[in-house]
Amino acid sequence: MFFPELPVILHKRLRQPQAADMEDHHMKLVECIPNYSEGRDEAKIAAIAACVKETPGCALLDIQKDATHNRCVLTFVGSPEAVEEACVKTAKKAEELIDLRFHKGAHPRMGAVDVIPFVPAMDMSLEECVALSKKVAERIWEEAGIPSFLYEASATRPERRNLADCRRGEFEGMPEKLLQEDWAPDYGTRAIHPTAGITAIGARNPLIAFNVNLDTDNVEIAKSIARAIRASNGGFRSCKAIGLKLEDRNIAQVSMNLVNYEDTSIVMVFEMIRALADRFGVRIIGSELVGLTPAKALLDCAEYYLKLENFSAKQQVMEYHLIDLESGDAGNE
């Protein structure tokens, strides 16, 4: 998915054998982008991230945190075996540190580790990522006592493919949901972990997390726009969207996942949101990308055109990290 020089670039960070040996063995890489329900406590976020940094064979590429959503997202890449270990370690650390009974944030959530997606990176198939997701789900149940739903390509039932359907009810409503006939966890018993809730785990293709901020405090406008553009309501085929209120900024936000950026581009949704916002007499005041984004998705999106807030190509585009690794300028932070 990246480029042929990837083994050479990554071998130092991944603490693997020399690049030539890796090429001979057709090195497999998987990307993992778990979301944790903590975006305010720096010490807790650092402790979770340390579980990845300390795992041989893993490279932690990015940490995104948001106090309003009270959520953080790690992006790391490594061999399937290393990524499995890192995922289980972070889940156990999140179970230790995060208590959802006291969690408040703008973003929907059902677990301390809310979602764990696996994405094929190099010489990995989606089917192999599905198998990995099941191994991780089983271990997180056995070692941390956290049940899980399998979602996206790993889903065992059609209604579990969509993350939003799995998460509906959130932490507070999940005990009752698990008692429904169709909603027993794929791993674990029909009871959430008392403080860490339940996790969604699955394999998927790359997506872009893209948010657009509006100059209004009326969250109903953001929700109306989200309904119009998301696939489930007849909007863009590869767009998932919700409307949120950012209390600390007193503005509304359209928060999106673009699950196939070749099919539904950033520009397409941005322009549609602009047009719909105009109908309400509302302007776009900024946008943001959450986590790492494929460079290809940004080639047609000039920074000034999208009014990106706090965007740093150096920090948020995966290829820049890989270039730094090749030059020896970057290391684990």
Located regions from the model:
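Short, positively charged and aromatic/hydrophobic N-terminal segments
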Residues: E5, I9-K12, Q16-Q18, M22-E23
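Hydrophobic alpha-helical signal peptides and transmembrane signal-/tail-anchor segments
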Residues: M1-F2
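Long, contiguous binding/interaction regions
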Residues: H26-E333
